Amino acid sequence: EITTRLVGSEMCIRDSSYIGVHRAQRDALEAKPDIIVIEFINDADDEFYESCMDSLVRMCLEQDNNPAVMILEPSTEGGTSPQAAHLKVAQAYNIPMISYHDAVMPEIEAGNFTWADISPDNVHPNDDGHVIMASLLTKFVGNIKDNIDSVDKEAKAFDTSTVAPTGDVFADATIGSRQTEDIVKTTDEGTFTDVTTFQKFTDGWGTTTGGTIKFEITAKNIGMIYYMTVDGKSGVAAVKVDGEDVATINADFTSGWGNYAKAQQIYSSDEVATHTVEVTVVDDAKPNFQILNWLIS
């Protein structure tokens, strides 16, 4: 008898694997999954997201319970996909990549069905789309089962000498909040007195009156998860690191499809150090701003 438990880490977020590599340990890997399927359609097909996927896959492979790891590659209606960037990572670590993109796009081009048959929009599969996706996974597993006598069934520890294709930029990635003062310390809360929560992003900092908040953050790379809202009240914040202007972040999503958490990398370097970080709302007409969490690596 086999007991199966599904551990899901999906949320109403964007910039997928960038947030995913920071959330993975807390929201997925602590459950010690035996099989990990990684899927991120919101990634771009570029070096940044290749580096995010590199660190995420490596983090999964390094787990003590030696899980099986694979990448599932989706598609948009226009055929765009981060597949090329993700494939480089899959090949570097010799893990399977199953391509929904390669399965459906040739069939659509051949006229066997339309995109509308498998999706209600330009990205997300409907029930029929998910049936195709599931069939690709079951076919892959079934092929292993059919050839089980020739398969090495021993779970081996990951060889840590394996070269990371992009240098494991986001090694030890984690989430910073009010509860992690060892890496994120609020030095001057200012007007950001609200304790924010959105889905699993808890213990953040928010203001409804504009103003400034200051931190000391110990990291090599720093990113911000902030709250995009459709109510027209969230505005623009300027971010400084060690006194230097590094980012302007606009949390206004007026007339958009809904509120969501968005991430942006604001600082990167080669060494871990403690930095002063200052966030100031600069739009007096739209004084709301929520820092849901910090992305630390």
Functional labels for PLM-detected ranges:
Residues 2-8, 13:
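Single conserved hydrophobic/aromatic residue that forms the stacking wall/gate
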Residues 19-150, 205-208, 216, 227-238, ...:
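Alpha-helical cap/lid subdomain in secreted, periplasmic
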Residues 217-221:
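Short coil/turn motif common to extracellular beta-sandwich-like domains
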Residues 146-216, 227:
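Glycan-recognition and processing domains
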Residues 6, 122, 127, 174, ...:
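Solvent-exposed, flexible loop/coil residues
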Residues 285-297:
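Extended, polar beta-sheet/loop recognition surfaces of beta-rich domains
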